Amino acid sequence: MAGPELLLDSNIRLWVVLPIVIITFFVGMIRHYVSILLQSDKKLTQEQVSDSQVLIRSRVLRENGKYIPKQSFLTRKYYFNNPEDGFFKKTKRKVVPPSPMTDPTMLTDMMKGNVTNVLPMILIGGWINMTFSGFVTTKVPFPLTLRFKPMLQQGIELLTLDASWVSSASWYFLNVFGLRSIYSLILGQDNAADQSRMMQEQMTGAAMAMPADTNKAFKTEWEALELTDHQWALDDVEEELMARDLHFEGMFKKELQTSIF
């Protein structure tokens, strides 16, 4: 037989639940704009810009080569894929993996990420845990097992309390992960307010990801262009155009009436 239902004071909703939601939301908004202010522009070399433009030209040739004559297509393809001195064959780039110990820019970016992501979470989480400790804020609308008690009832040591109830400290962490859709709606998909995404990137090492290997990109594009054949898309376009009923008489009458009035 189930025990009596726990009745919460309505002041908890006004002075605990809503303040935690509002504080978490505005901290995320401030983090987004602070990250924009601290964001450093990544400097690209002339070689990187040139390589990216070459890859774009090759991709455009594969996609739209059917709209140029076959000789023009083969000439451009020969420039990229010539087995002897083609661009993708003769061009070799030296890829140097970045090292945080030798690159001050990476160290600065890591420090900025810690300042805008880790430090606010520690400070705000500690302040909320100290200010609103010991409160039961809400209850999830479905039953949970006892394994969820350490996650949803931080700061409350009640063995008899149902695992569906959420403490104030756990309510803060639920808001950190639950406001992602609100941030995406207000700030756009790629925003710095989503603290959970920042944490995942730091844990998976996405923030220190290796740069793309230009040589592999050239090889992939060479293979894709090598498999592309020219298929003339404008074959018999003159006959098709002449066979259509273009209704020139109606167009001329409309222009004549417009000029009269």
UniProtKB/Swiss-Prot annotation:
Keywords in alphabetical order: Endoplasmic reticulum, Membrane, Transmembrane, Transmembrane helix
Gene Ontology, cellular component aspect: EMC complex; endoplasmic reticulum membrane; membrane
One Pfam family recorded for the sequence: EMC3_TMCO1
Transmembrane segments: 15-38, 115-130, 169-187
Biological processes, Gene Ontology terms: protein insertion into ER membrane by stop-transfer membrane-anchor sequence; tail-anchored membrane protein insertion into ER membrane
Family to which the UniProt record says this protein belongs: Belongs to the EMC3 family.
Protein name stated in the entry: ER membrane protein complex subunit 3
